[in-house]
């Protein structure tokens, strides 16, 4: 299956007093990767295969986050090269889907590091009614190539 690779630059402000990226900032980095992967916009060099959702003002579909989970594996130090956030779909439901992520060291860096893995359940909502809307057959067909096993969290307790 296919994963979308989204390069995400760290900001100096992402660091906390322990000189690594703060856990809340990791969620913001994942949000940035999610927006670039799923919402239609300008061509920024990211595979647009997942980008089917119109996020412009007045769009007919809104998205709501129903659930998020992050497993932090290694501290992330500041670096100038963008991290490689790999995004795929772990599940396609009726009106929701699970976006999965691996937050990795910059492409080409050896040894490669896996800093975090995460998942987000996203619900598609009809903007006019405020009610969940079904994933269309066109969306389902386009997204099928990006579906693989969901994140296997190892530190549940």
Give residue ranges: language-model regions.
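HotDog/MaoC-like acyl-thioester-processing domains
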Residues: 1, 77-81, 88-157
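Hot-dog-fold acyl-thioester-processing enzymes
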Residues: 1-65, 127-157
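Generic structural detector for well-ordered beta-strands
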Residues: 7-11, 71, 121
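Hydrophobic beta-strand-centered segment that forms part of the acyl-chain substrate-binding groove
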Residues: 37-97, 113-115
């Amino acid at each position: 299956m296919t994963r979308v690779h989204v390069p995400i630059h760290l900001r100096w402000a992402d660091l906390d007093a322990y000189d690594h990226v703060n856990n809340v900032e990791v969620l913001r980095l994942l949000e940035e990767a999610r927006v670039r992967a799923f919402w239609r916009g300008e061509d920024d060099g990211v595979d647009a295969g997942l980008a089917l959702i119109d996020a412009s003002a007045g769009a007919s579909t809104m998205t709501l986050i129903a659930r998020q989970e992050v497993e932090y594996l290694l501290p992330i130090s500041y670096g100038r090269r963008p991290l490689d956030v790999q995004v795929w779909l772990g599940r396609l439901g009726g009106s929701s889907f699970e976006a999965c992520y691996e937050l990795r060291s910059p492409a080409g860096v050896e040894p490669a590091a896996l800093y975090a893995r995460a998942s987000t359940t996203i619900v598609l909502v009809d903007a006019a009614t405020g009610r969940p809307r079904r994933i269309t057959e066109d969306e389902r067909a386009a997204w099928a190539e990006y579906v693989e096993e969901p994140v296997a969290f190892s530190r549940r307790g």
